[in-house]
UniProtKB/Swiss-Prot annotation:
Its main location: secreted. It is an enzyme of class 3 (hydrolase). This is Sialic acid-binding lectin. It comes from Rana japonica. InterPro entries: RNaseA, RNaseA-like_dom_sf, RNaseA_AS, RNaseA_domain.
Length: 111
């Protein structure tokens, strides 16, 4: 995965996330199945990108900034469109950095 895909998957252009709508996009369908969960970072790409600015090697980095997060969690195994629940929180995030760019969302609260 690269920075462009990371942005597409995790940095929406809106703060108003409707999990049932957004998670039906093809990027969240894996092998014909709905993705179990996905976390959206409600922030600018520039702010998220800054997490990796000091990462000289390819590794996981914990942000010093707390981000507003919206996690969509599949609530049932059903045919598309799959039903999702939404969980919002504010916390630090862990991302995998490659070439000083976030490429993978690794976790919430710790690395």
């Amino acid at each position: 995965q690269n920075w462009a895909k990371f942005q597409e998957k995790h940095i929406p252009n809106t703060s108003n996330i409707n999990c049932n709508t957004i998670m039906d996009k093809s990027i969240y369908i894996v092998g014909g199945q709905c993705k179990e969960r996905n976390t959206f970072i409600i922030s600018s790409a520039t702010t998220v990108k800054a997490i990796c600015s000091g990462a000289s090697t390819n590794r996981n980095v914990l942000s010093t900034t707390r981000f507003q997060l919206n996690t969509c969690i599949r609530s049932a195994t059903a045919p598309r469109p799959c039903p999702y629940n939404s969980r919002t929180e504010t916390n630090v995030i862990c991302v995998k950095c490659e070439n000083r760019l976030p490429v993978h969302f690794a976790g919430i609260g710790r690395c």
